[in-house]
Amino acid sequence: VAVPGGINWDELSWEEVKPQVWRKVFVGERLMMILYRFGPGCRWPEEQHEAEQGGYILKGKILLRLPDEDREIVLGAGQGYWIASKKPHAWEVPDEEVMLMDIFSPPRFELLGQEQR
């Protein structure tokens, strides 16, 4: 599936994490990449974690909430985001399917092999 310099995402299977949430996961030594698909109306509860988080929206739009700054940001296809370590954040998918690449460093091993909230 992965060779130095390349990851063949087509060879990875979609895993349903919970209703309206599917993912494909790649884990390296210091980096985790998750290709997500979210259905319309999906919400991700507020969370914070040790890992830095960045990402890129491939399709659709998300509403990113940063409660400690009292900010909401709409991000669409072609836009990205970066969330500092331990920064509270939440988001939702307003009205159409979203596909995005989430990237964590270090990897969030707690996400593997178990359902997310």
Residue ranges and their predicted role:
Residues 1-35, 112-117:
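A short, N-terminal "cap"/entry segment at the start of jelly-roll beta-barrel domains
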Residues 31, 40, 50, 69, ...:
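A generic "binding-loop/recognition-motif" signal
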Residues 65-67, 92:
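A generic structural motif
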Residues 69-85:
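Short acidic-glycine-tyrosine-enriched beta hairpin
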